[in-house]
């Protein structure tokens, strides 16, 4: 194919080039390349195909979305004013601001104001134009400037922009809008500005020394950026119209036989049309951006309702009135929300919470302190004493000190009594010290029974008191009997070990009589 870049669909007039037999991979005799529903035989990059045809001007995408011509024109004017004001605050050259406004006008002749945010596209055009004209600005600075302009337009005190998730989302939307602008314009973003052309034409007319005339023509040219003249006429015709209007305003005579603009290829009809469009700006009333945005929102909701009705989601007569302020442009309310329906069923979590509330007072009663100690603490002390008694190994009992204490006892019965006392449940400490030990022992036995029933873990006790043997059942007595047998078994083992230890001790004393003195 002839060139390497594609023009925007619908924006540029089709400029077709003949297909060569070997270039671009096209087969000989082929009619072109079908892209979408259009047939292209080539692409021609030229500034002449950046002008809109008449059919695009008469029926724009915004008009097809339901916006009237006045609202669309107001949005175009406000968007270009925002770009100009932001360029001044960003200290961009005038050429960059002009490029941004032209790109803005071109884009919204291919896309609708209803489907694309005017403010986001304005930011994207400023950011893109600054890079095109070799004066790049950071996207953060662009966002901050537009944020300040919005506050000033709404007559609010400017507040610094917060760097939160909303800022990140806005930044991503602007980047996407910039890509969309490039795609819709076919990456043909070059703009030929009439700034230099005005100075060159005034030099030909020998009026370049009249600074007032030059500045006035320049001002008219900057104001024409808010209109659609840059997508309808050549830059040479726009430059001639700005000079013509400035000379008529300042009452400076210019050659008219023949007319001077004919020398530069402009016609009288084009000059009059451009002057009429520029002067219309000064007779327009100041538009309110909030009113324009509300109109756009109305159209958005109307389109969404039409789509929902086409899909059968909304009945034909259930659409709310768009003019009612109280409706808020939301679809018809449902008789019962899904949250209310879910709330009627009891969830497992709510049942669990109710059980906890019921068990709360029972737990509090069970944890009431007895004799200054909680039941849990009492059971812990009992378990500790039992663990200590159980952990006494035969080796420990067979130590010399233990042997000495055992030999000091009078009878085996007294030995068993001392052992049973040491291994029985230790009574809890009394808060009232004057209480007798016997009553506290009875209370301790009762507490230990309660704890055993609560925890459902029966502990085998080695105490041989008559009160416990009466209260226990047959099964427990059997188990205690078994345990007693076991205890006798361990006791016999300890005795045998102690005897063997005594024998070895006597043997040791015979061999080494000096050491026996120290042991005694």
Curated annotation (Swiss-Prot):
Domain of life: Eukaryota
InterPro entries for this protein: Cyclin-like_dom, Cyclin-like_sf, Cyclin/Ssn8, Cyclin_C-dom, Cyclin_N
UniProtKB keywords: Cyclin, Nucleus, Phosphoprotein, Repeat, Transcription, Transcription regulation
Stretch list, region Disordered: 309-520
Region (Cyclin-like 2): 196-280
Composition-biased stretches (Low complexity): 407-429
GO cellular component, one term: nuclear speck
GO biological process per UniProt: regulation of RNA splicing; regulation of transcription by RNA polymerase II
Biased composition (Basic and acidic residues): 356-366, 440-453, 472-481, 489-514
Chief location: nucleus
Cell location: Nucleus speckle; Nucleus, Nucleoplasm
Signal peptide: none
Modified residues (Phosphoserine): 330, 337, 347, 350, 368
Molecular function via GO: cyclin-dependent protein serine/threonine kinase regulator activity
Keyword Phosphoprotein: yes
Free-text comment on this protein's domains from its UniProt entry: Contains a RS region (arginine-serine dipeptide repeat) within the C-terminal domain which is the hallmark of the SR family of splicing factors. This region probably plays a role in protein-protein interactions.
Subunit structure: Interacts with CDK11A, CDK11B, CDK12, CDK13 and POLR2A, the hyperphosphorylated C-terminal domain (CTD) of RNA polymerase II. May form a ternary complex with CDK11B and casein kinase II (CKII). Interacts with pre-mRNA-splicing factors, including at least SRSF1, SRSF2 and SRSF7/SLU7.
Protein family membership: Belongs to the cyclin family. Cyclin L subfamily.
Summary of the function given for this chain in its UniProt record: Involved in pre-mRNA splicing. May induce cell death, possibly by acting on the transcription and RNA processing of apoptosis-related factors.
Protein's name in the database: Cyclin-L2
Protein encoded by which gene: Ccnl2
């Amino acid at each position: 194919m002839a060139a390497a870049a594609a023009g925007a669909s619908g924006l540029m007039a089709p400029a077709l080039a003949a297909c060569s037999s070997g270039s671009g991979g096209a087969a000989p005799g082929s009619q072109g390349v079908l892209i979408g529903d259009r047939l292209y035989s080539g692409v021609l990059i030229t500034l002449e195909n950046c002008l809109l045809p008449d059919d695009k001007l008469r029926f724009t995408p915004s008009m097809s979305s339901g916006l009237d011509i006045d609202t669309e024109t107001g949005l175009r004017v406000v968007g270009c004013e925002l770009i100009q004001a932001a360029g001044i605050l960003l200290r961009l050259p005038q050429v960059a601001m002009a490029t941004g406004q032209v790109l803005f006008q071109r884009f919204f002749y291919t896309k609708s104001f209803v489907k694309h945010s005017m403010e986001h596209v304005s930011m994207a055009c400023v950011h893109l134009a600054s890079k095109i004209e070799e004066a790049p600005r950071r996207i953060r600075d662009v966002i901050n400037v537009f944020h300040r302009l919005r506050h000033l337009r709404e007559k609010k005190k400017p507040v610094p922009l917060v760097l939160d998730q909303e800022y990140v989302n806005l930044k991503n939307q602007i980047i996407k809008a910039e890509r969309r602008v490039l795609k819709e314009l076919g990456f043909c973003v070059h703009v030929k500005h009439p700034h230099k052309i005005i100075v060159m034409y005034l030099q030909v007319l020998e009026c370049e020394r009249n600074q007032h005339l030059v500045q006035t023509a320049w001002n008219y040219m900057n104001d024409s950026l808010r209109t659609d003249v840059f997508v309808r006429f050549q830059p040479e015709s726009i430059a001639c119209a700005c000079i013509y209007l400035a000379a008529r305003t300042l009452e400076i005579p210019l050659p008219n036989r023949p007319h001077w603009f004919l020398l530069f290829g402009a016609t009288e009809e084009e000059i009059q049309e451009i002057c009429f469009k520029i002067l219309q700006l000064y007779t327009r009333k100041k538009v309110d951006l909030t009113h324009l945005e509300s109109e756009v929102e109305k159209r958005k909701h109307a389109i969404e309702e039409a789509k929902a009705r086409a899909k059968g989601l909304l009945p034909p007569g259930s659409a709310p009135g768009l003019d009612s302020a109280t409706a808020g442009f939301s679809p018809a309310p449902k008789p019962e929300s899904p949250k209310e329906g879910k709330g009627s069923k009891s969830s497992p979590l709510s049942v669990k919470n109710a059980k906890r509330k019921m068990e709360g007072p029972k737990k509090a009663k069970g944890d009431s302190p007895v004799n200054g100690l909680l039941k849990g603490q009492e059971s812990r002390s009992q378990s500790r004493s039992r663990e200590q008694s159980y952990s006494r190994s035969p080796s420990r009992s067979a130590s010399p000190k233990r042997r000495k204490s055992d030999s000091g006892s009078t009878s085996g019965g007294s030995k068993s009594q001392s052992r049973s006392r040491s291994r029985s449940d230790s009574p809890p400490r009394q808060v009232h010290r004057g209480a007798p030990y016997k009553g506290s022992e009875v209370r301790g036995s009762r507490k230990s029974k309660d704890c055993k029933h609560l925890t459902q873990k029966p502990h085998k006790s080695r105490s041989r008191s008559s009160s416990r043997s009466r209260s226990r059942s047959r099964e427990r007595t059997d188990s205690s009997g078994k345990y007693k047998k076991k205890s006798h078994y361990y006791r016999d083992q300890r005795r045998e070990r102690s005897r063997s230890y005594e024998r070895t001790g006597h043997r040791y004393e015979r061999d080494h009589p000096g050491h026996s003195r120290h042991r005694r």
